[in-house]
């Protein structure tokens, strides 16, 4: 009897333990179910469900709502429409000066693009006036050229020295450099007459009998290069070549 009662107590304890174990497992399952339910609720807002739901194409009947989630027809979105080529001109024509719809007057005073290609007709009166001006400009230059050539010729003719009419100074210079120092001084009759006829004013006769139009200075330089014949020696009685000296007769 005692053994049977002991066995019953052991079986009752086992049964109570088993019931507690089953209760604990059921409680764990319930807690796990609650956690999964809360996770699913979170995923509806932040998880995969929300991403999958919003990644699709938007519905056509969506409308913009205010804070009270009431649809307002004024807030309806207008779909984007492509540019209408009929109402909007091309950009090149829009920025061209001949564009039909320009409202500013930036290029108002400028000629159009087609007018720029036209030829400009010249005015015949203006052209003739320009030719006259060119001719008048050429005339002074030609006159200056003529004067320059004349001045150079004059300088070359007269040994690059100005023309002097004072023959007394030139005669003295010529006598000094020509070696005619042995001639008597002025105031002695025939010799002075001979000297004045030789160094007198133009025209003079050269050694060959030709009339020369040269300046006395040029004649002086020529005498230095080609010295003239010495003056004729005076004969007895003071007669020269013009008075019929025997030296002239020989």
UniProtKB/Swiss-Prot annotation:
GO molecular function: calmodulin binding; protease binding; structural constituent of myelin sheath
Residues bearing the modification Deamidated glutamine: 234
Positions of post-translational Phosphoserine modification: 31, 40, 141, 144, 151, 172, 188, 206, 241, 245
Comp. bias intervals (Basic and acidic residues): 1-28, 95-113
PTM notes: As in other animals, several charge isomers may be produced as a result of optional post-translational modifications, such as phosphorylation of serine or threonine residues, deamidation of glutamine or asparagine residues, citrullination and methylation of arginine residues.
Cross-referenced InterPro entries: Myelin_BP
Residues modified to Omega-N-methylarginine: 175, 181
GO cellular component: cell periphery; cell projection; compact myelin; cytoplasm; internode region of axon; myelin sheath; neuronal cell body; nucleus
Phosphothreonine modification, residue list: 149, 152, 167, 197, 211, 226, 229
Sites of Phosphotyrosine modification: 146, 199
Expression across tissues: In the embryo, isoform 1-isoform 3 are found in neurons within the central nervous system (primarily in pioneer neurons important in the formation of the cortex) and the peripheral nervous system. They are also expressed in the thymus, gut, lung and kidney. In the adult, isoform 1-isoform 3 are highly expressed in the brain (mainly in brain regions rich in oligodendrocytes) and spleen. Lower levels are seen in the heart, kidney and lung. Isoform 2 is also found in cells of the immune system.
Annotated function: The classic group of MBP isoforms (isoform 4-isoform 13) are with PLP the most abundant protein components of the myelin membrane in the CNS. They have a role in both its formation and stabilization. The non-classic group of MBP isoforms (isoform 1-isoform 3/Golli-MBPs) may preferentially have a role in the early developing brain long before myelination, maybe as components of transcriptional complexes, and may also be involved in signaling pathways in T-cells and neural cells.
Protein name: Myelin basic protein
Taxonomy of the source species: Eukaryota, Metazoa, Chordata, Craniata, Vertebrata
Gene: Mbp
């Amino acid at each position: 009897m005692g053994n049977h009662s002991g066995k019953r107590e052991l079986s009752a304890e086992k049964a109570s333990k088993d019931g507690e174990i089953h209760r604990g497992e059921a409680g764990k399952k319930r807690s796990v179910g609650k956690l999964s339910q809360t996770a699913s609720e979170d995923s509806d807002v932040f998880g995969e469900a929300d991403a999958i739901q919003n990644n699709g194409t938007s519905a056509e009947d969506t409308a913009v709502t205010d804070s009270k989630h009431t649809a307002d027809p004024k807030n309806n979105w207008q779909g984007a429409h492509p540019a209408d080529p009929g109402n909007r001109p091309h950009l090149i024509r829009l920025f061209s000066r001949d564009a039909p719809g320009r409202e500013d007057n930036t290029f108002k005073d400028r000629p159009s693009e087609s007018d720029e290609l036209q030829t400009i007709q010249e005015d015949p009166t203006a052209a003739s006036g320009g030719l006259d001006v060119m001719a008048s400009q050429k005339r002074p230059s030609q006159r200056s050229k003529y004067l320059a050539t004349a001045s150079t010729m004059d300088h070359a003719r007269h040994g690059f020295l100005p023309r002097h009419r004072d023959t007394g100074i030139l005669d003295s210079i010529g006598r000094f450099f020509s070696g005619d120092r042995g001639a008597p001084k002025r105031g002695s009759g025939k010799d002075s007459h001979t000297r004045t006829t030789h160094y007198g004013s133009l025209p003079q006769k050269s050694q060959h009998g030709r009339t020369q139009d040269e300046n006395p200075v040029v004649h002086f330089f020529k005498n230095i290069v080609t010295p003239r014949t010495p003056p004729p020696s005076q004969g007895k009685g003071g007669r020269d070549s013009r008075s019929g000296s025997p030296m002239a007769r020989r």
